[in-house]
Amino acid sequence: MRAVVVLLLVAVASAKVYDRCELARALKASGMDGYAGNSLPNWVCLSKWESSYNTQATNRNTDGSTDYGIFQINSRYWCDDGRTPGAKNVCGIRCSQLLTADLTVAIRCAKRVVLDPNGIGAWVAWRLHCQNQDLRSYVAGCGV
């Protein structure tokens, strides 16, 4: 029982809900501004609508896959959660690695996703809320 409590505390301690500007600065420092032709405001907008900037966000899909982390990266194609039938794991990671405050793995995988033919359009929330919009407000006042 004590081990379970310790594991839960570790999981909670590693979770993070980013502030908009804090995320913008972290993404910029990781080379996301302009990556594969996508401006920083696009990445911040995508993160807002996919996860509300929450690294612990998960969403189960009707096909049995799950979306994980701040970018809601899908277990059918990009990561291994050990329960999605026929998963491809193109990023070569465990989905649980996408649920931490450290964005390194999530950013590396998002950079891989955006190189596919759908580009940033692979994210439904980006298509619905960010595409062809004025996104300046997502980085306004952030000093980036």
Curated annotation (Swiss-Prot):
Keyword field: Antibiotic, Antimicrobial, Bacteriolytic enzyme, Disulfide bond, Glycosidase, Hydrolase, Secreted, Signal
Chief location bin: secreted
E.C. no: 3.2.1.17
GO molecular-function term, one example from the UniProt record: lysozyme activity
Keyword Disulfide bond included in the entry's annotation: yes
Active site, renumbered: 50, 67
Source organism superkingdom: Eukaryota
GO biological process, one term: defense response to Gram-negative bacterium
Signal peptide (UniProt feature, chain positions): 1-15
Family of the protein in this entry: Belongs to the glycosyl hydrolase 22 family.
Full protein name: Lysozyme C II
Source organism: Oncorhynchus mykiss (Rainbow trout)
